């Protein structure tokens, strides 16, 4: 499972490979292809200065989540693919709002991106726990397409935790076990993959002494 996902990501490391893949499912002259291309370009530009803790360009994560949807989960809906490419833009990039996404793309994409995004911490007077509880409630009743994006996002985050601190790894593992796995089980999406990814991370904490 995880090895297949890693192979998919390795085989599509850049723009050329990504759009060769998109061209297999959507004509280059179609509105769907143009929509995905616009989302790709918008996201790449918005995140051009952002990097992950591992040092990797942040946009690689956004592209990887969309690849998991396309290649592993066989998503063929252009709105969902575009939303996957844009899924962190409301939460992480100043100046982007749900209304702006709707104007730039469409209301469905904007709604999907909103559903997978935490709201600004200022709304909760800096209380991260309350913000997380509110977000979990929102995602718990979200439409299936939003859940698919979020679970693919969470899976990719877990399989790339190697570049983060042990404290963050433990926090992400607990959160996934407590909240995301039950949602995955409810929708029957990526259950075994998340379990396998969590097992990998936890095994990495074990030091075998000879």
Q: Where in the sequence are the language-model features?
A:
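Active-site helical microenvironments for divalent-metal-assisted chemistry
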Residues: 1-210
